[in-house]
């Protein structure tokens, strides 16, 4: 990915700290939890942290936040590594795992206990919520166990580690400020018991640090200077600062927040996405309708289009909802320049050229990319024979008003080949047209009639003899509701699924040159849109985006 230079409120903060000599190296990180696949919203966090580090000649870490073993696994680790590699976001500061710091986190927890800044609590989760009060005016009250001595707390905490207690029987809480208006500062839990096998540590641990405790410690150990995260962590910043100040006695790392990327007609919640996968509503985490990076990759999106979209969506502290069509517009502009042109007939009907010899096959040179900005003059040979496939929608026996393509007695151009005039049709017993007949003007090999007559319509075609069969998937938005964050709290998000989010075209006919196409190749199917071979199902093509859209950036 090319270096990006930009200015926003985050770079303003960094510029000020650099100018005052508070930091020497800008060091950022991206800390995904390996319990699901990354999505388009994750791309914003990657873009910000990676690009800011690159902009300042600094370091960018990838750290797997695997401190909660319940749903984490190596499948997700590998998918995240693949996504960052695909995006070109090289973690030049290193790849780390939060679980590698478990021993250090434990030692820091004991330090807080010895200093009287943490205690073991026996309250249940429900009791703890009751004792903490709320931010609507209900005051908190201290746990009956808040004044245990450091010696008693150390003994209990070590027994927690030894596995003496059941899940939820005890927690370790930071002793901060029960009167704080910020609920996160009212003696937050920093360790809990979970007798769950960890995907990397096995059964070595049965107590695990909470994110709000582990995260600042990990940042400090790695030398992170700016912990840039999404806006939902803003109220957690005082706790982040408390941990850094009490354990490391310094100002940095510094946490700052930005607004999440919300996109129309989809969901970003891992819980919702996992439900779609586990209930087989979609074809896995990489279903081309999903907002996951693996789904977008399988659909045919490019890393450049995703980072360009994120940049154009803006970096601010104000939440906004970005139209998915903006991403499509960015990609469409890229593919218009870069995608090779090919011919595909999605809904075929046979066109028989009656005056063309049955044993004849001509090769016509069609342009690979006629876009003038590209200056690509290369061509490819396409076979022309007596029997061709054309789009069913390009012929009407009784045409609608202003129809300019093939009808009985009318003449059209066969793209890059001859002019043909329709002479008749074949029908089945039900009266359906099954084949169209025409005569070619064999003097118009270049499409230009000698008498200068005007022919307004041009249609595409492939040879029946020289083509390949394919299944084509035409994708639309996954949900009918534009803003899925606005649905009622008691609503089932699945009720908003779009029943027409995918249409399967089973018997498309593609030009023969596509037999060597590979997943990751992208083509413009002339007049039909942009397509790519599916990475899971051989012989299937996915529509990436349509040729045009009314959306304006």
For each feature predicted by the language model, list its residue ranges.
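A glycine-rich helix N-cap at a beta->alpha junction
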Residues: 76-103, 108-109, 116-119
């Amino acid at each position: 990915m090319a270096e990006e230079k930009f200015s926003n409120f985050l770079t303003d903060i960094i510029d000020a700290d650099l100018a005052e000599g508070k930091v020497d190296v800008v060091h950022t990180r991206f800390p995904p939890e390996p319990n699901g696949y990354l999505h388009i919203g994750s791309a914003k966090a990657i873009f910000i942290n990676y690009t800011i580090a690159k902009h300042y000649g600094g370091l960018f870490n990838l750290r797997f936040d695997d401190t909660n073993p319940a749903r984490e696994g190596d499948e997700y680790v590998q998918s995240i590594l693949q996504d960052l590699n695909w995006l070109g976001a090289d973690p030049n500061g290193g790849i780390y795992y939060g679980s590698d710091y478990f021993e250090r986190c434990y030692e820091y927890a004991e330090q807080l206990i010895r200093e009287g800044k943490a205690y073991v609590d026996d309250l249940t989760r429900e009791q703890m919520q009751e004792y903490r009060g709320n931010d609507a005016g209900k005051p908190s009250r201290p746990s009956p166990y808040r004044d245990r001595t450091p010696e008693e707390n150390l003994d209990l905490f070590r027994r927690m580690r030894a596995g003496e207690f059941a899940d939820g029987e005890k927690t370790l809480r930071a002793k901060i400020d029960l009167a704080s208006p910020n609920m996160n500062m009212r003696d937050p839990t920093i360790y809990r018991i979970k007798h769950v096998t960890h995907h990397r540590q096995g059964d070595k641990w049965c107590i695990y640090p909470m994110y709000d405790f582990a995260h600042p410690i990990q940042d400090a150990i790695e030398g992170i200077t700016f912990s840039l995260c999404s806006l939902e962590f803003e109220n957690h910043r005082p706790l982040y600062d408390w941990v850094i100040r009490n354990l490391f006695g310094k100002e940095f790392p510094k946490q700052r927040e930005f607004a999440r990327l919300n996109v129309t007609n989809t969901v970003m919640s891992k819980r919702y996405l996992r439900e779609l996968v586990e209930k087989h509503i979609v074809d896995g985490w990489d279903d081309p309708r999903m907002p996951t990076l693996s789904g977008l990759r399988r659909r045919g999106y490019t890393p450049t289009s995703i980072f360009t979209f994120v940049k154009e969506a803006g970096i601010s502290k104000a939440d906004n909802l970005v139209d998915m069509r903006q991403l499509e517009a960015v990609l469409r502009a890229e593919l218009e320049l870069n995608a090779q042109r090919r011919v595909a007939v999605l809904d075929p009907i046979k066109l028989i050229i009656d005056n063309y010899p049955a044993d004849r096959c001509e090769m016509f040179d069609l342009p690979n990319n006629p876009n003038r900005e590209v200056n690509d003059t290369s061509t490819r040979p396409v076979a022309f024979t007596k029997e061709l496939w054309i789009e069913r929608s390009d012929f009407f026996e009784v045409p609608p008003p202003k129809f300019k393509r093939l009808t009985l007695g009318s003449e059209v151009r066969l793209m890059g080949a001859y002019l043909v005039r329709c002479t008749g049709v074949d029908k089945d017993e039900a009266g359906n047209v099954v084949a169209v007949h025409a005569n070619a003007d064999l003097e118009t090999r270049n499409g230009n009639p000698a008498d200068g007559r005007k022919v307004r319509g041009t249609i595409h075609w492939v040879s029946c003899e020289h083509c390949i069969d394919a299944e084509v998937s035409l994708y639309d938005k996954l949900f009918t509701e534009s803003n899925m964050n606005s649905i009622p709290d008691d609503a089932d998000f699945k009720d908003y699924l779009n029943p027409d989010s995918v249409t399967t075209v089973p018997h498309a006919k593609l030009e023969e040159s596509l037999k060597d196409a590979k997943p990751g190749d992208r083509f413009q199917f002339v007049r039909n849109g942009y397509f790519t071979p599916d990475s899971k199902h051989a012989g299937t093509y996915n529509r990436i985006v349509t040729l045009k859209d009314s959306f304006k950036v």
